[in-house]
C-alpha cells in the first residue's frame, strides 16, 4: 500500500486496538486516507463511523459520544475545518473529557509556502488546551516508521484518558499526508505490540474529622466516579448533599433539591446558614448563592480532587485532598444541622411544586420539572443546555438520580444539540432540554446525512424568543428596554416548525400543559422536536414568586 494509506491504516487500527469505538468524520480531500481507513474498519465491524458535514457539529457529536464513557476520535481535513473543532476541544479541556483529534495536513515542506488550505500553525492550533499534541510528518518508509506511530498513539490515548498528566482531556495529532491520497492494496506495516500504560491507581482517602456542621457540594463532573464519591461521602457521613444536575450525585436520601433557594433565603447566622465546612467535588458554576457560600470567611473549604487542577474560584480552599472519608459517629451538632437541612429541603421542594402548579401555562421551570420526571420514569438520559435550562432543572427538579449531561466546562450554548445526539447514539433514548437561542445556534446538527443513523432523541425547545436568562440578571434593568432587546435579549422571530421541516425533522407545538405532558413523557424514538412557546417577560416575576414561596415555607 502507498505511504499515506499505510499511515492512516496503522493509526485507525491502533486506535481500535486501544479501545476506540466511535470515529466522527467530516469529509475532505487531505483527510481522505483516514476516511478510507475508518470506513474499512467500520465495514469490518471494528468501530462505528459517524459522518457529519459541519466540523463544529462533528466536534460536539464526538464530545457527546465521549461523555458517555467511550473512546472517540474526530477527523477533519486541513485549514478552517480544524479551527471549527476549537469550541468542542475547549469544552473537553475544561470539562476533562477524553477526545482524540486527528487533523490532516499537507507535508511539512508545503507549510508556509502558500499552498492551498494550509495553516502555518495548524499543528499548534489547540495549544495549550490539549493534554498532548504531536505533529506527525508525512510518511516516507511505513515499515520502519510504523512502530513509532503505534507508540505515539499509545502515549496520546494514555494522556487523553488521564493515565498521565493533569487528568482526562483532549489530545491532538496533526498528521501529514502526501499524494497519492487514494487507497491502494497491501499489507499493514508490521511492528511490535501496543504500549500498555497504567495509571497511578486509586488515591488513599484523607479522613475528615467529625464535628463541624458540614455540607457536601457537588458541581459539574463528567466522570461518574466523582459524583459517586460525593454521594457516598454525604450518605456515609449523614451530611446534606447540594448537587448540581450534571454532577452525577443528584440523588439519594441526602440530596437537597432547591438548595440554592435555601442558601439565598437563610441568614448566615441562622440554623441553616450556620455552615462550618463545605466539602467540594467537581466544578460548581451554576448559582451565585453557591459562589457566596464558597467565599465566606467563616466556612472551611475542603476540595476533593485527584487531578492536577481543582475548583477554587473564591480562593478560599483550606485543603485539597485526592479522596475523602469520614470515620466515627456524628456529633449532636452535625445531626441537628443535617436534620434541619433535610426538613427545609422537603418544605422547599413542596413549595416549588405548589408555585409551579398554581400556574396554568407553559414555562421553562415547569418543563424542566416534567422532563426530569419523564427521564426518571423511563430511564432515559437527560442533556441540558448550559444556560437557563440547566438552572431551571437545578431549581425545580426533584433529585431523582437521572443521568444528566451539560456542557458546563466552559458553559457555552454552542454545540448542545450535537452533544445530545452523541450522547443518544452512545447510550440510547435521550431527552434534550434547551432554549431557543441554544437550539438555533446548533441548527446544523439537525442536518440529515444519507445513510447515517438518527438518534432516539426528543429535543424540547423552550422558546421565549430570545435570551431568557438575561431577564434574571442585572442587564434587564440597567438600560432602556429597546437597547436591552437589541443587544442583550436578541429576539429572532424564527419559525421553528419551518426550520424543522427544512431539515426533515418531526415537530410539534403543544399549546396546553396536558398536550405538552403527552409529548414530553413519550419515550424518545427517532429525532423529533417539541417546541414550548413561553413568555420571556414572565421569567423574572415567576422566579421571584417561587423564591418567595420557599422563603415563606422555611421561615
UniProtKB/Swiss-Prot annotation:
Domain of life, source organism: Bacteria
Reaction catalyzed: isochorismate + 2-oxoglutarate + H(+) = 5-enolpyruvoyl-6-hydroxy-2-succinyl-cyclohex-3-ene-1-carboxylate + CO2
A biological process from GO: menaquinone biosynthetic process
Record keywords, A-Z: Magnesium, Manganese, Menaquinone biosynthesis, Metal-binding, Thiamine pyrophosphate, Transferase
Record pathway: Quinol/quinone metabolism; 1,4-dihydroxy-2-naphthoate biosynthesis; 1,4-dihydroxy-2-naphthoate from chorismate: step 2/7; Quinol/quinone metabolism; menaquinone biosynthesis
Enzyme class: transferase
Cofactor stoichiometry and binding remark: Binds 1 thiamine pyrophosphate per subunit.
InterPro entries, per the entry: MenaQ_synth_MenD, THDP-binding, Thiamin_PyroP_enz_TPP-bd_dom
Cofactor needs: Mg(2+); Mn(2+); thiamine diphosphate
GO function terms (MF aspect): 2-succinyl-5-enolpyruvyl-6-hydroxy-3-cyclohexene-1-carboxylic-acid synthase activity; magnesium ion binding; manganese ion binding; thiamine pyrophosphate binding
Entry EC no(s): 2.2.1.9
Annotated Pfam families: TPP_enzyme_N
Entry-linked SUPFAM superfamilies: Thiamin diphosphate-binding fold (THDP-binding)
HAMAP family tied to this protein: MenD (MF_01659)
Function field: Catalyzes the thiamine diphosphate-dependent decarboxylation of 2-oxoglutarate and the subsequent addition of the resulting succinic semialdehyde-thiamine pyrophosphate anion to isochorismate to yield 2-succinyl-5-enolpyruvyl-6-hydroxy-3-cyclohexene-1-carboxylate (SEPHCHC).
Subunit structure as annotated in this protein's UniProt entry: Homodimer.
PANTHER family in UniProt: 2-SUCCINYL-5-ENOLPYRUVYL-6-HYDROXY-3-CYCLOHEXENE-1-CARBOXYLATE SYNTHASE, PROTEIN PHYLLO, CHLOROPLASTIC
Family: Belongs to the TPP enzyme family. MenD subfamily.
The protein, known as: 2-succinyl-5-enolpyruvyl-6-hydroxy-3-cyclohexene-1-carboxylate synthase
